[in-house]
C-alpha cells in the first residue's frame, strides 16, 4: 500500500508491552489528553471473575477510562485469535464512526499480529480427528504426540509446550485434516488491518527492573486476595487445567497449590518465575516487531510526551 493511500485510512494506536510494564497506566493517562477509546488486547482479561491475578483495571480506572473487550467470556469458554480479530474490528469501526481513535492496549502479541496482518484460513475443527488425537494421548501421553509434531512441524513444536494439550491437539489436527503444517498455513496472511497504525511498546530499560516489578506485583496480588479469587474458581467444579483460563500465569500455580501438589512458598516462586518467562516471550516478540517506537516504563511522563509528540497531530 502506498504512503498516500495509507494516509487516507482511519487512525489507530497500538500500545504493547510485557506484563507489569505500565501499559494500562499510560493508556489511561493518554485518554485524558487524546480523543481515544481503549480496547483491551489481552487473552486473560476477557475472563469474568479473573480480576486480581490478571491485574485487570479496577473500578476507578475503568470509570476514568473504559476498556472494551473486558469480561466477555466465562473461564470455561475458549476464545481464539480469530474471535479477537472479529471483535476488535467491530469495536474499532464503532469508535472510528464516533469520530474517535481506537487505542489498543495489551500484551497478547498473537492478537496484535492477527489484527495487524490478518489470519490465514485454517481448517475447521473435526470432532472425529480430535477424538482420535485425544485417544492417542490417553494411550501414549502428550509427550509422544509432541514428538510426533516435532517430526512434521518442528517450528510449531518449538513454540508449543508438551503440557499444552489444546494447542498441541490443534496443530496435529490441522496437519491431519489438510496435509499441511500449521506453520505452512499461518505463513499465508489474511486481510491486512485497514487502519493507519502508530505502534508503541513500553518496557523498563533493564531486565532486572522488569523482574523487580513482576515480583512486586505478584506479592501485591496475593495481598489483595488472589488466593480467594482462585478458590472461588476452584470451588465451581467445572474448571480444570486443560482450559486456557486456568493455564494462565499465576492461576496455574495457585491451582496446583489448592490441589495440594505444591507448597505455598513453591507456588509463589513458580508464579513469579512463570510471569518472568511470559515477559521474556513478550519482549522477544516485540524485538522482532517492525515500526515500533519504544518507551521507558521508568519514565512515565516522558513516555506520555513521546506518544503525544508522535500521534498528537492526528488528534487535531
Curated annotation (Swiss-Prot):
The record marks 108, 130 as: Interaction with substrate tRNA. Its EC number is 2.5.1.75. GO terms for molecular function: ATP binding; tRNA dimethylallyltransferase activity. Keywords: ATP-binding, Magnesium, Nucleotide-binding, Transferase, tRNA processing. It catalyses: adenosine(37) in tRNA + dimethylallyl diphosphate = N(6)-dimethylallyladenosine(37) in tRNA + diphosphate. Pfam families: IPPT. ATP binds at residues 17-24. The keyword Repeat does not apply. InterPro entries: Dimethylallyltransferase, IPT, P-loop_NTPase. SUPFAM superfamilies: P-loop containing nucleoside triphosphate hydrolases. Substrate binds at residues 19-24. Its cofactor is Mg(2+). Catalyzes the transfer of a dimethylallyl group onto the adenine at position 37 in tRNAs that read codons beginning with uridine, leading to the formation of N6-(dimethylallyl)adenosine (i(6)A). This is tRNA dimethylallyltransferase. It comes from Shigella flexneri.
